[in-house]
UniProtKB/Swiss-Prot annotation:
Binding site for substrate: 142, 174, 212-215
Protein name: tRNA (guanine-N(7)-)-methyltransferase
Sorted UniProt keywords: Methyltransferase, S-adenosyl-L-methionine, Transferase, tRNA processing
Catalytic activity: guanosine(46) in tRNA + S-adenosyl-L-methionine = N(7)-methylguanosine(46) in tRNA + S-adenosyl-L-homocysteine
SUPFAM superfamilies membership: S-adenosyl-L-methionine-dependent methyltransferases (SSF53335)
Amino acid sequence: MIDENHPMRAAGNFFGRRHGKPLRPHQSNLFEDLLPRLKLDLATPAPQDLRSLFEAPVETVRMEIGFGGGEHLHHESGRYPQSGFIGVEPFINGMAKMLAALDQAPRPNLRLYDEDATAVLDWLPDASLAGIDLFYPDPWHKRRHWKRRFVSDANLDRFARVLKPGAKFRFASDIEHYVNWTLQHCRRHAAFDWQAESPADWNDAYEGWPGTRYEAKAFHEGRRAAYLTFIRR
């Protein structure tokens, strides 16, 4: 039976491989001990007030989809202790890096999920997020794989449902085709407004941006990034 309140799930995953290098024993232990304490339980209904998900008192809740090695998410959750953060990363080695960082510097305002981000989006209450970040997602270069790109009409509908009016959807990529793809999809979606006024609005990194390992590699290889910000109407 289809839930009429939420968009249908795509037939395929939006992410590629889930595992890379074998985990070290300490990393495996973190998956067994730390991740269960931080992982969202989607088997239970989401609280209407998401602030109750966190150990620390928070004022708003943001989400980062596909946080990679967790550089930005760990940085932001430390920089804004008054905000709650939900981080989603299905790639096991990326999650391992994040868990290692949290083992050294815990974040009581952070929860994690290691599977499909659309499951979290469909679990969240309406108008419950103050922002969604999607940085350097898999571009799925081949045309036949474009349907796997996370930016899609269905997922923008999901974003529109869970974002509060005035909340931001931020997208960064070093792949020009995916940047243009995202601009086209968001500008034709009734729920999102792109307010850029000059090239600096997409050429300059976000305020306080810490950079990521992937981004550094892209720059080293001669690629430039675009940093887009869309406002939920």
